[in-house]
UniProtKB/Swiss-Prot annotation:
Keyword Acyltransferase: no
InterPro entries: Ribosomal_uS15, Ribosomal_uS15_bac-type, uS15_NS1_RNA-bd_sf
Protein name per UniProt: Small ribosomal subunit protein uS15
GO BP field: translation
Pfam families in the cross-refs: Ribosomal_S15 (PF00312)
GO cellular component, one term: cytosolic small ribosomal subunit
Entry superkingdom: Bacteria
Length: 88
């Protein structure tokens, strides 16, 4: 689980407006933070299949949000990808 202070920083860094918590950019950034936090856990606990299912669900949800953002506004999509460092 992400600490609320880290979550607030992520929201502030990616928000489009003052109280924006629901835009695709914020949602993708929060999912990315959670995924990055869980990744080391699976390097040490390779057999945690139940947890891996949750991780894959988060990755899938992030992918769907990114696909939506790419279809709606490609400029925002490319800016977000560059900011989060998701694509090589």
């Amino acid at each position: 689980m992400i600490a609320s202070s880290i979550k607030a920083e992520v929201v502030k860094a990616n928000a489009r407006a003052a109280n924006d918590t629901g835009s695709p950019e914020v949602q993708v950034a929060l999912l990315t933070a959670r995924i990055n936090e869980l990744t080391p856990h699976f390097k040490t606990h390779a057999k945690d299949h139940h947890g891996r299912r949750g991780l894959l669900r988060m990755v899938s949800r992030r992918r769907k949000l990114l696909d939506y953002l790419k279809a709606k506004d490609a400029d925002r999509y490319t800016a977000l990808i560059a900011k989060l460092g998701l694509r090589k």
